[in-house]
């Protein structure tokens, strides 16, 4: 099987539109990690993503009759832009079905390259179903974003370039994984020619379809998929791609949202370029691999796979990057509600930089303050800060990994609502598009009074809300069924310490 793919890769016609991207050393990251780190800069492609390779190679394999019918695909962005440009160069009509939640930068990217955009549904499965309907109705040829041998071969040209650009020692290549087209192509080429090189997939911990399939020994469908790294938000690994990955991918690492944000900053520090969340997975994976294995002196390559990110999402990335690096702690600290307490607390913090401070007067004998403090993962870790404050008589609750605190509570500190009774608190995610907030409130209905509400647009595909509902005790059993009818993911946060300390 590998030999067949290598032949396809060597004969792929990608360079009519794609460029050979540089393999660039990440000097600062290399020094920090004690390993030689290289970035394969696929964000420098004409469509700012590696996807142009597979899309163009697939189109070149179509017959004249198939090209005349026109092509269609479903995509949330990068494959769509790659196919639009490939079709334009080859003179083929391309229709791209995209979810209504697709970032505007990707929609405009498709239109500017000559693709016809059809916005349909709130998720990729809905867009996919509609694109297949167009295949039946219009006779279009469907171009799969990853699960096709010619697409896989096109993506495999990335590996061909890496081995040519770095013929010396190479210990591992870290590859972002969504549907698996990129890692399958890279694994096929590298394992045929240089089997000693490890191929390591990297996925978000809430979108790990390859890891789940490898563990099960077969393709599985994830019940839910996180969409922060929207470029790899895939519920099931492809069949063709898994056939390769099962035998030739050495391992899969998963990383958190905060770790992805930290990796985006790392890439920026070394290259002064901004990558999209999915594009930073390789670097995030290298950092975790080095930390967990304690390796040093190795040569490691990360595929920087794309840079199609909405500018307004960078606010969220900046907020979370220091947390992912272990350079900031988010804590709740209890101090006496009396003059001089603030000063005593600041003295206890010492020379550490305070990055965030939220407080509202409380009528009780104790005050709870929401604080961000700069830390250092090695010289002054979070654990040392918490231990120091506790020893000096300041009770601390660590909120660094608390999503409710990071997304909502930090913007809401304002005191307890003493006269609010029977309050239960839920966190929701819903598809982000114009009118989405109104639609969410409409679905929430009016059975129970809304006692608290916070929404913030993160420039992402999902809107995030925390809501307090006044539900009498004898009606609590009705809540799960009522929320299930809304149809959006939700989490019960009523017992969350951040809520209890600051708002409950």
PLM features: what roles do these ranges have?
Residues 1-436, 440-504:
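PLP-dependent amino-acid enzyme catalytic core
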């Amino acid at each position: 099987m590998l030999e067949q793919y290598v032949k396809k890769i060597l004969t792929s016609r990608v360079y009519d539109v794609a460029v050979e991207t540089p393999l660039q050393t990440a000097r600062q990251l290399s020094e920090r990690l004690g390993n030689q780190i290289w970035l394969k800069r696929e964000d420098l492609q004409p469509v700012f993503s590696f996807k142009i390779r597979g899309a163009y190679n697939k189109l070149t394999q179509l017959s004249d009759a198939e090209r005349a019918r026109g092509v269609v695909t479903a995509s949330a962005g990068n494959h769509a832009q790659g196919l639009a440009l490939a079709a334009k160069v080859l003179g083929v009509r391309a229709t791209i079905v995209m979810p209504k939640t697709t970032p505007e930068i990707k929609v405009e990217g498709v239109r500017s390259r000559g693709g016809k955009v059809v916005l349909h549904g709130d998720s990729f499965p809905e867009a996919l179903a509609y694109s297949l309907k167009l295949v039946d109705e219009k006779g279009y040829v469907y171009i799969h974003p990853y699960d096709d041998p010619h697409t896989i071969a096109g993506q495999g040209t990335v590996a061909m370039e890496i081995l040519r650009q770095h013929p010396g020692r190479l210990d591992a290549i870290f590859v972002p994984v969504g549907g698996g087209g990129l890692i399958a192509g890279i694994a096929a080429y590298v394992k045929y020619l240089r089997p000693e090189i490890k191929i390591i997939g990297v996925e978000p911990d809430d979108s790990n379809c390859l890891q789940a399939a490898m563990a099960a020994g077969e393709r599985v469908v994830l019940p839910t998929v996180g969409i922060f790294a929207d470029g790899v938000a895939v519920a099931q690994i492809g069949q063709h791609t898994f056939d390769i990955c099962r035998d030739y991918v050495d391992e899969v690492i998963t990383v958190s949202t905060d770790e992805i944000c930290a990796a985006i900053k790392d890439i920026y520090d070394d290259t002064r370029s901004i990558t999209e969340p999915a594009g930073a997975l390789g670097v995030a994976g290298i950092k975790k691999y080095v930390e967990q294995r304690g390796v040093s002196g190795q040569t490691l390559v990360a595929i920087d796979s794309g840079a199609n990110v909405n500018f307004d999402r960078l606010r969220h990335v900046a907020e979370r990057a220091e947390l992912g690096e272990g350079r900031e702690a988010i804590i709740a600290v209890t101090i006496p509600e009396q003059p001089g307490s603030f000063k005593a607390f600041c003295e206890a913090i010492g020379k550490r930089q305070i990055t965030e401070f939220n407080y509202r007067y409380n009528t009780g004998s104790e005050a709870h303050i929401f604080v961000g403090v700069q830390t250092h993962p090695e010289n002054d870790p979070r654990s040392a800060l918490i231990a120091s404050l506790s020893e000096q008589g300041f009770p601390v609750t660590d909120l660094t990994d608390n999503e409710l605190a990071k997304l909502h509570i930090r913007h809401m500190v304002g005191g307890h609502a003493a006269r609010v009774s029977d309050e239960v608190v839920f966190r929701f995610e819903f598809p982000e598009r114009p009118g989405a907030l109104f639609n969410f409130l409409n679905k929430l209905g009016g059975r129970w009074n809304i006692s608290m509400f916070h929404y913030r647009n993160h420039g992402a595909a999902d809107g995030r809300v925390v809501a307090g509902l006044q539900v009498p005790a004898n009606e609590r059993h009705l809540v799960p069924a009522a929320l299930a009818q809304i149809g959006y993911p939700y989490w019960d946060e009523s017992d969350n310490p951040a809520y209890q300390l600051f708002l409950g």
